[in-house]
Amino acid sequence: MLARALMLALIVAVPLACGDEPGFDPAAPRCLHLPRPPSRDVLQLERVLPDIAIEGGVALLQAPDDATRWYLVTQPGVVHRFGVDGGAAEVVLDLSTKVALAAEAGLLGMAFHPDFASNGEVFVSYTAPGGKVFTSRISRFRSSDGGRTIDPASEEVLLELEQPYSNHNGGDLAFGPDGYLYFGFGDGGSSGDPQGNAQNPETLLGKLIRIDVDGGDPYAIPADNPFAAGGGRPEIFALGLRNPWRFSFDRETGALWAGDVGQNLWEEVNLIERGKNYGWDFKEGPDCFEADTCDETDLVPPVAYYRNISSASVIAGHVYRGTQLPAIAGLFIYTDFYRGTIWGVKPGSEPVVLADAGARGLVGFGEAADGELYALDYQGGIYHLRAASPPEGPGLPDLLSGTGCVAVADPQGPPAHAIAYDLNLDFWSDGASKRRWMVVPDGDSITVDPDGDWQLPAGSALVKTFYRDERPLETRLFVRHDDGAWAGYTYAWDAGGAEATLLGAGETRTIDGQPWIFPDRGDCLYCHSEAAGFSLGLETSQLLRTIPGPDGQPRDQLDALVELGLLRARPTAEPLPAADSDAPLADRARAYLHVNCSSCHRPDGPDGRANMDLRFSTALVDAGVCDQAPRAGDLGLVDARLLRPGDPALSLIHI
C-alpha cells in the first residue's frame, strides 16, 4: 500500500503523499478489511431444505392437521409438496396450461378448507386468459388422497373478475376463524387507480372480500357483510386498498393483518376490519394527495408504514405465535420484496427492525403448525426464522475519522493511501456533487468482467462524499468484506463539516430547507445488485477518460491505474458520453438511462415490473422500450408506451 500510494502521488498528483500527511500513523486504520458493525438483528434467516430450490414460488403453507409437509405454490401454475425434513418434491397440481402468466399474474394463492381432512377441498386464485388483459379467478379443487394430489379436473369456478390492467391483482386467499373465505383484489392496476375502483362499492377491485363457500352455489354471502343488504357488491368486506398482496389471520386473536403495496410514497401494514375504508386512492400512508378535499373521517390509518424509496412491495407475514423466539412473541412480521428488512409491529407501537436480510426477493412467509415462521424467496430459497447470533467484535467506527477512509488533517478529503477517480457521467443525486476514491489492499488488483464491470478484491472499500454548495452532507462507504460480500454504510456530516457519524438506520433530514435521504444499510444493495456488478460506477466505459497529470497535462485514467498495479492490463471499451459532450443527443440520452436506470432495468435486475434493458451496450431495438406497452400501469394516458419515438408526452420513460 505504501509503494502504491507513493506512485499515485507521482502519477496523478494526489495532494498528500503517504507518510507526509500531518498526524500520519502507520498503525492507524487504513480503510482496509473493515469490520461489519455489530449486528442489530434479533432474527436471522437460516436456509433450510437446500435441495428444494424451485423458482417462482409465491406461497408456502401446510394443510390442516398435517405438520409433516409443506406445499409450495409457484407463479407459473404448479403446486409442489415435500416433507418438512426434505426429500423429493412432488407435483400435486399443475395449472400451467390454464394460467395467464405475467409480471404480477399467474397462480397467486392457495388455501385449504378448514375441514380439508374430511372434505378434501382446496381453493386457489389465479389469472386466466380472457377479458381486456386477463381475468382473476377463484376456484375450488378437490383431493381424494389426503393432499398427495389435487385433481385438476375437479375445478369449480367460484368467482371471476376481469382485470383492466396487468398489475395489482392481489391474489392471496385464506380462511378466517369464522370459517369464511377471504380474498384480496388489487385496484385493477395502472397508476393512481384511474378508474376509481378502490372507493367504488359497485366493483370488487381494490377490496378485501369475504364469501361463504359452504352455504351456497357456488357461494353464499355472510349476513354481516357490509353490503349484504345492498348499496354495493355483497362480497365486499373492506375497501380502499391498492394491492393487498399478502394477508393473514392471527391464530390467537383472529385479527386480520394485510400488507397494502404502495405507489410512490408509502408501503402500508393494516389491520383489516369489517366495513372499514383504508383510504386508497386519495390517501397513501399518512399522506393525502389533495389535502383540501381529503376527508379522513371514516378512514382507518395503517398500523405501520414506511417510505418506498428503495422498497416497492410490502410482504405481509404472520403474527408470531411460536415458542422458539420469545423476543418477538405477538409481533406481526413483515418485509419488503426489494429491500429485505424484516420488521415486527404490534398495534399502538412503533415497528422494530428485527433483521436485515438483504435484497433476497422475499415473496412471502409460511406459518408452520407449531407457529414457527419460514420465509420464501422467489429464487427458491426457504428460510427458518431463528434467533440471531450475539454480536462479535468492535465493529465499524462510529466516527468517519476513525475508519482510515479520510485524511486526518482534512476529513473531507482522501487519505494518502487512497486512489481518487472520476467518472464520465454522474448519477443524478438531487443536484449534489460528489468526490470519490477507493482503497484496495496492496498487492491485489481489480478484475474486469466481460461486460466491463470492475470487481474489487475482498478487503477493499469505495468512498463517496456528497456535497451541496460545497457543504458535505453524507459519506457512503461501500465495503467488500473479507468474506467477499458487499455492504453499504452511511456517515452523516455535522453542520460545520468537521466530522461525520455512522447512522444505524436510514432517515430523512431537512438540510438548508431541502430534504436529504440517508439510505438504510439494506437500501444500498437494491441498486448495487449482483446483476449490476455491485460497484456501479466502476466500469470501463465510465472510467475511460483523461485526468490532470502532475505536470498539468491530461493523463489517461486507465493508464494511470495500470501503472499503479490496480489493473493488470488496460481494458478496452467505448467511453460513456458525458452530458455536456459533443456526442450525438441520442447517445447522451442512452448514457443517462444507463447510469440512472440500468442498475435495475437489466437482465436479472431487481425490478421485474418492466421488461427493459437500459444498458448503454444494449442496442435500442433490443432494449424492450420502443413502442412497448407498459406492464405496470400507464399513468392514465391513452395508448401510452414506455418510449414512443417522437412523442415524449406519451412516453412513460420521459414522464
Residues covered by each model-derived region:
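Bacterial N-terminal signal peptides
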Residues: A5-P15
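Acidic, Gly/Ser/Thr-rich repeat motifs that build Ca2+-stabilized beta-propeller blades
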Residues: C18-G192, R246-G262, S310-E350, G371-E372, ...
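N-terminal pre-domain segments of enzymes
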Residues: D20-S39, S389-R435
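Surface-exposed loop and turn segments in beta-propeller and other repeat-based domains
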Residues: E90-A103, S154-Y165, G215-F237, F282-I309
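A detector of repeated loop/turn-to-beta-strand junctions in beta-rich toroidal repeat architectures
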Residues: T135, A198, E202-L205, W266, ...
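Beta-propeller blade signature
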Residues: R137-G146, P201-V213
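Flexible internal linker/loop segments at domain or repeat junctions
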Residues: N277-S311, T572-A573, A619-L637
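Sequence context surrounding c-type heme c attachment/ligation sites in exported
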Residues: P351, A359-G361, P391, L400-S401, ...
